[in-house]
Amino acid sequence: LDVKYKLEFLSILQEMKHQKKLTVIMSLHELDLAERISDQILCVNGTTPERFGTPQEIFTKGYISKLFGISSGSFDEKTMNAELPKPCGKPSVFVISGDGTGRNIYRKLQRKNIPFATGILFENDLDYPVAKALATEVISTESFEPIKGKTLEVAKVTLSECDHIICCRPHFGTFEKANEELLSYAKQLGKIIK
């Protein structure tokens, strides 16, 4: 089923379950849908039932990777993101992003097998989980706190070692002055900025 019909079908099942007090048993391979629709999940490893519980009990850090034997790429249980392996090597590109603006760039760089660094990202930023999965280096900082000077200095050193800079942000928020300073620093160094 395509996304539209899958959502309609699952919505109808959920409605029937509530109205008619039905128990619905499904075999789902779309983990994100299983997490959203299921009250209880049974995980089967090969032919053996391995774990039974609520979505919160099943989707714990590292469990899905272990269950499926994921050794190439990664799966983040918190966001339900599956990502291909990160490129290896020294980063040649530094990405200044945040607020979800970098995810498409990270994936494009991964597809081209270009190692990259990114920062400074707050650990609750939309870009952070994808950055952790795909970037060679992620300069991050605690959520809801101002960026520390030491973190900015680490970002400047990493940026100075990269050949190209990509800035995904049209402007920066109040707590992102360090990223604005990082962009100015890149310009001072004469880096190629896209």
Predicted regions and their residues:
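ABC-family nucleotide-binding domains
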Residues: 2
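Helical segment within the ABC ATPase nucleotide-binding domain
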Residues: 6-19
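H-loop/switch region of ABC-family ATPase nucleotide-binding domains
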Residues: 28-29
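A short, surface-exposed alpha-helical micro-motif characterized by mixed small hydrophobic
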Residues: 34-36
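Receiver (REC) domain switch/active-site residues of two-component response regulators
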Residues: 39
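Conserved switch/coupling elements of ABC/ABC-like ATPase nucleotide-binding domains
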Residues: 42, 46-57
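ABC ATPase nucleotide-binding domains
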Residues: 68-149, 167-169, 173-177, 192-194
